[in-house]
Every structure is written in structure tokens, then in C-alpha cells.
UniProtKB/Swiss-Prot annotation:
Organism from which the protein derives: Thermoanaerobacter pseudethanolicus (strain ATCC 33223 / 39E)
Summary of the function given for this chain in its UniProt record: Involved in the gluconeogenesis. Catalyzes stereospecifically the conversion of dihydroxyacetone phosphate (DHAP) to D-glyceraldehyde-3-phosphate (G3P).
PROSITE patterns in the cross-refs: TIM_1, TIM_2
Cysteine pairs bridged by disulfides in the record: none
Pathway of action: Carbohydrate biosynthesis; gluconeogenesis; Carbohydrate degradation; glycolysis; D-glyceraldehyde 3-phosphate from glycerone phosphate: step 1/1
Protein name (database record): Triosephosphate isomerase
Length: 248
């Protein structure tokens, strides 16, 4: 059985003091969660948040990383740095990174391989735009992004990868793919992983849905056969809302 994973991506919100307050509120509300709980604060919050979540069931994620261990890469953060401050998961290839910062499939792949080689679990984001969806290209786009991201990932490592299907048109818009639609895409993703790594490995890979996930729609999403959790945006900035999602 795949253990569900619910992760809150705070994006560019929360100063360190606000971050501490948020996790302190969250801890008692999610202590009995059956799902794996991950918070993904901005880089400057990670150390403070890590101190507060020690000894709890909350795990730490980062929003991005560079693929080199060190060097003259001004403004970048390396996997070694993240590892040392207690990070377990790293979001890679979020549509906002692709859209605003020119992140390509090739860059995403380099980051995925680097994360895995340093013992970090990548949460690899894939998803189609509204125009791609309207042109009937959802499956083509999403499956291709996935194949590109996983190039060179070993059979042993694939089980440490989490995939997040985030249709771009649903992020922050209030629009959500129907649970059935999301499940169809996620099923196709799992079949693609099976074609690359075999059915047994594919059955162990967790695939989340992301895109306007909120307390009102989480149980419907989680009732589907292949949806293994959620990558939550705005709703993860309010402890009580995120807790309701985690405790679906």
C-alpha cells in the first residue's frame, strides 16, 4: 500500500517568525495524521521550521535546489546545504519555476538526479497549460514531461520519487480538475512509469494531485484509486485549513 503524502508548498510567503508560528499551530492539529505530512517553506525559513518540527510527524521540504554541490552559482542553493538542515523532500520543476525562471525539462532532470544522489526525495511537478488542455494534448504533455524528468533514474531510486500532477490552469485559480479527470491522468502517469520500470515499481510510486486543493475537495480527490496525496498551495498557509486537508 502506498502511504498518502500531503505537502504544503508555501511559495513566497511567511517570514521566519511567521513560519514558526504557523508550524507551532499545525503540530497539534496533525499529530494523528495517517498521511505523511510535509511543509515546504521558503529557504530562509527552513532552519527555524526544522527546529520546531523536531520529534513531530511533520517532515521538511524545500521549494527548489541547484544540481551542483557547490560553486560560483550566485543565488543558488545546493543539495548538500538542504540535507544538512534536515530537508527530506525537494519540489522540482514547479510550473512557476518553468514559467517565470525558464526552467527546462533538461534542468528538471539534472535536479532530480542530483537530489536522488544526495538522498533527497524529489517531488517532480508536471502539468499542462489551458491551451494544451483545450487542444487535447494533456496526456502527451504530461507523460513527456515525466519521461524527460526521469531520464537516468535507476530502478532502485524510482520509489524515492514523488510525482505531482498540477494542471497549470488549476494553480491558484480556484479551478480544480474533477477528481475523475485527475485520476485518469494520474493512472496514465503510473502506466508510463510501469512501461519504464515495471508494474511492481510503478505500484510503489506516489503520485499527488495539485491545483486549488482545499478542505472542500480533498476527500473526493483522495477517494480515487490512483491519487496518493496532494501538493497544496494557498490552503497550506492557514494551519486549520491545511490540517483539515491532512486529516481528510
Amino acid at each position: 500500500m502506498r502511504r498518502p503524502i500531503i505537502a504544503g508548498n508555501w511559495k513566497m510567503h511567511m517570514t521566519p517568525s511567521e513560519a514558526v508560528k504557523l508550524v507551532e499551530e499545525l503540530i497539534p492539529q496533525v499529530k494523528d495524521a495517517k498521511a505523511e505530512v510535509v511543509v515546504i517553506p521558503p529557504f530562509v525559513d527552513l532552519t527555524e521550521v526544522n527546529k520546531v518540527i523536531q520529534g513531530t510527524n511533520i517532515l521538511l521540504g524545500a521549494q527548489d535546489m541547484f544540481w551542483e554541490e557547490k560553486g560560483a552559482y550566485t543565488g543558488e542553493i545546493s543539495p548538500l546545504m538542504l540535507k544538512e538542515i534536515g530537508v527530506k523532500y525537494v519540489v522540482i520543476g514547479h510550473s512557476e519555476r518553468r514559467q517565470y525562471f525558464g526552467e527546462t525539462d533538461e534542468m528538471v532532470n539534472k535536479k532530480v538526479l542530483s537530489a536522488l544522489s544526495h538522498g533527497l526525495s524529489p517531488i517532480v511537478c508536471v502539468g499542462e497549460s489551458l491551451s494544451q488542455r483545450e487542444e487535447g494534448k494533456t496526456f502527451e504533455v504530461v507523460l513527456n514531461q515525466t519521461k524527460e524528468a526521469l531520464k537516468g533514474v535507476s530502478h532502485d531510486d524510482i520509489v524515492n520519487v514523488v510525482i505531482a500532477y498540477e494542471p497549470i490552469w488549476a494553480i491558484g485559480t480556484g479551478k480544480t480538475a474533477t477528481a475523475k479527470d485527475a485520476n485518469e491522468v494520474i493512472k496514465a502517469l503510473r502506466n508510463t512509469i510501469a512501461s519504464l520500470y515495471g508494474k511492481e515499481k510503478a505500484s510503489l510510486v506516489r503520485i499527488q494531485y495539485g491545483g486549488s486543493v482545499k478542505p472542500e475537495n480533498i476527500s473526493e480527490l483522495m477517494a480515487e484509486s490512483d491519487i496518493d496525496g496532494a501538493l497544496v498551495g494557498g490552503a497550506s498557509l492557514v494551519a486549520s485549513d491545511f490540517a483539515k486537508i491532512v486529516n481528510y
